[in-house]
Amino acid sequence: MNMSVLTLQEYEFEKQFNEHEAIQWMQENWKKSFLFSALYAAFIFGGRHLMNKRAKFELRKPLVLWSLSLAVFSIFGAVRTAPYMLYILMTKGLKQSVCDQSFYIGPVSKFWAYAFVLSKAPELGDTIFIILRKQKLIFLHWYHHITVLLYSWYSYKDMVAGGGWFMTMNYGVHAVMYSYYALRAAGFRVSRKFAMFITLSQITQMLVGCVINYLVFSWMQHGQCHSHVQNIIWSSLMYLSYFVLFCHFFFEAYIGKTTKARKVD
């Protein structure tokens, strides 16, 4: 196991965190993510059915608080993990930043790695607001939530290579995305270009994810990266499907609407 630990000032809760207990718990309980996913899917179909004949709920204030909470969490996660990844990348190179496993057990990053994985369960709550407010629920939304939850819990238990990249990227994108959601829910008018930027960031994240998987597979053949073929296959399928779905969403939401508007004019 390659170890490269960046010394950062730790908060007390980061010092007290026991990563060994966390990893053991996930090894014993990761399959519960399937139960959460099943309950989530049941809520989606059951909730939409119940709301068919009911008036929508506004829930503006709860939505602001929800989005703001996730934005703050993601910002802290990005601020605490990005310096680690940047340090490894600049001092040890790309290969070490991908293959290094100390992200899971390092003084600061260990807490945020586990917090990231656990956060994928409460993030399912995003959909509750969509259902109760009777907004359009697209396939990408719930498919993304379910698969990220399953893959995150499945991968954390094995401390697979590439995890530092995956988690840090997601923290960064979510920091911007949930901040945008909070502003919109609070009634602020935000430029359409900002929403386009977020989607482009997500598309870029998926491309980088595919590249990381390729690198892990290549270096794994030489015993330099800790992972296994099954994980890489699932991860690659997941990132490729995200890439296709987010590209389709970008075209439908921004390019397609603009083209239709011009034809009408």
UniProtKB/Swiss-Prot annotation:
**Transcription regulation in keyword set:** no
**Pfam families, A to Z:** ELO (PF01151)
**Pathway(s):** Lipid metabolism; fatty acid biosynthesis
InterPro entries in the record: ELO_CS, ELO_fam, ELOVL6
**Membrane topology listed for this record:** Multi-pass membrane protein
What the record says about family reads: Belongs to the ELO family. ELOVL6 subfamily.
Record-linked PANTHER family: ELONGATION OF VERY LONG CHAIN FATTY ACIDS PROTEIN 6, FATTY ACID ACYL TRANSFERASE-RELATED
Tell me, in a sentence or two, what this protein's role is. Answer: Catalyzes the first and rate-limiting reaction of the four reactions that constitute the long-chain fatty acids elongation cycle. This endoplasmic reticulum-bound enzymatic process allows the addition of 2 carbons to the chain of long- and very long-chain fatty acids (VLCFAs) per cycle. Condensing enzyme that elongates fatty acids with 12, 14 and 16 carbons with higher activity toward C16:0 acyl-CoAs. Catalyzes the synthesis of unsaturated C16 long chain fatty acids and, to a lesser extent, C18:0 and those with low desaturation degree.
According to UniProt, the name of this protein is Very long chain fatty acid elongase 6
Q: Which organism is it from?
A: Gallus gallus
Tell me the lineage of the source organism: Eukaryota, Metazoa, Chordata, Craniata, Vertebrata
